[in-house]
Amino acid sequence: MNKFEDIRGVAFDLDGTLVDSALGLAAAVDMALYALKLPIAGEERVITWIGNGADVLMERALTWARQERATLRKTMGKPPVDDDIPAEEQVRILRKLFDRYYGEVAEEGTFLFPHVADTLGALQAKGLPLGLVTNKPTPFVAPLLEALDIAKYFSVVIGGDDVQNKKPHPDPLLLVAERMGIAPQQMLFVGDSRNDIQAAKAAGCPSVGLTYGYNYGEAIDLSQPDVIYQSINDLLPALGLPHSENQESKND
């Protein structure tokens, strides 16, 4: 029995699932840290902070940067810095700076993963409604989807500011299923991280975990999704569609 035979809609995470956004996010984080005269983190470190929305990203960046600054000053024999600004206020300032810089670099620092457009097109052609659920701040979502030419595939888009509770809370997924007019168990959710799989389980949605995303450096199998795929187009046969690579071969 195909565990996805009752699927009537598919929803996707964005960062690490459909798009590689690490370059743009890391650039904006580092520019914001630099503006506050704090150590910059670099892409490899920022990747481990992605997934819980911009506010949590700023908290993680600030915590690391203050610790790194203290370590560097101690190594150089300098006294620690007494911050006049409370950490909460610094997070707020950092977020404001991040939003400004990310708006400048988001499009040029974000790329579709392989087979994403073909897979979305095949699912849409099958008549399945498609949704997007991301913790990314809502104002950045629509312009990014348009720039990458994938906005046309989604009938429902939920950004991080559209719900009170972000993933891993089930609310965003339940809202998408409601707007699609289907039961949660009829909506497949595809993601790359622990947050995605936890949200799917809490909402009662079957889940696909992709291995190529960020996921805080953890293997996706630790989150126990219903199915694990190496590539996004691997989910097409499970939904009764030809693998996109096979389809491309037929069209050549």
Swiss-Prot record:
GO terms for biological process: carbohydrate metabolic process; DNA repair; glycolate biosynthetic process. GO terms for molecular function: metal ion binding; phosphoglycolate phosphatase activity. InterPro entries: HAD-like_hydrolase_sf, HAD-like_sf, HAD-SF_hydro_IA, HAD_sf, PGP-like_dom2, PGPase_prok. Pathway: Organic acid metabolism; glycolate biosynthesis; glycolate from 2-phosphoglycolate: step 1/1. Belongs to the HAD-like hydrolase superfamily. CbbY/CbbZ/Gph/YieH family. The keyword Protease does not apply. Its cofactor is Mg(2+); chloride. Keywords: Carbohydrate metabolism, Chloride, Hydrolase, Magnesium, Metal-binding. It comes from the Bacteria. It comes from Shigella dysenteriae serotype 1 (strain Sd197). PANTHER family: PHOSPHOGLYCOLATE PHOSPHATASE. This is Phosphoglycolate phosphatase. It catalyses: 2-phosphoglycolate + H2O = glycolate + phosphate.
